[in-house]
Swiss-Prot record:
The protein, known as: ATP synthase subunit b, sodium ion specific
GO-annotated molecular function: proton-transporting ATP synthase activity, rotational mechanism; proton-transporting ATPase activity, rotational mechanism
Family, as annotated: Belongs to the ATPase B chain family.
Compartments, record wording: Cell inner membrane
GO biological process: sodium ion transport
Species lineage: Bacteria, Fusobacteriati, Fusobacteriota, Fusobacteriia, Fusobacteriales
Gene source species: Propionigenium modestum
Signal sequence range: none
Length: 168
């Protein structure tokens, strides 16, 4: 039970003045600070929104740049592979050309050697023919000088053939 002298609800005078001061403070705050603070908050909100938009744009640009970079890398790899294939093809063509030139030169050398061999054979035939002719003349001279009978003529002929065989 409450004491009899005291009212059931009591308001302290200090509390009353604190409420009045608070209301006055709220009035001044609303009148002088609400608009500048609202402007600062709106500016901050707008800046954050712009930063988010810019971040999204930057992200899209980075993704686009990454895609372009990958395309460039892929293109460079393709071009490098094509260059490598062209270089290999040129090397193969050069190899074939060198082989053909070597074969052609070899064929020329073989033909030249064959021609030279034929010339040497012909020269040897001519020399042999001259020697045979010379020997035949010598044989005929011997036969005439000795007045040969048939037996001696056969022996001289065999001897002549033996000499020709040895000289070859």
């Amino acid at each position: 039970m409450a004491p009899q002298n005291m009212p059931a609800v009591s308001i302290d005078i200090n509390m009353f003045w604190q409420i009045i001061n608070f209301l006055i403070l709220m009035f001044f705050f609303k009148k002088y600070f609400q608009k500048p603070i609202a402007k600062v908050l709106d500016a901050r909100k707008e800046k954050i929104a712009n930063d988010l938009k810019q971040a999204e744009i930057d992200k899209e640009m980075a993704a686009k740049a990454n895609g372009e970079a990958q395309g460039i890398v892929k293109s460079a790899k393709t071009e490098a592979n094509e260059m490598l294939l062209r270089a290999e093809k040129k090397a193969d063509e050069r190899k074939e050309t060198i082989l053909k030139e070597a074969n052609t030169q070899r064929e020329k050398m073989l033909k030249s050697a064959e021609v030279e061999i034929e010339k040497m054979k012909e020269q040897a035939r001519k020399e042999l023919q001259l020697e045979v002719t010379d020997l035949a003349v010598k044989l005929a001279e011997k036969m005439i000088n000795e007045k040969v009978d048939a037996k001696i003529g056969a022996n001289l002929l065999d001897q002549f053939i033996g000499e020709v065989g040895e000289e070859k």
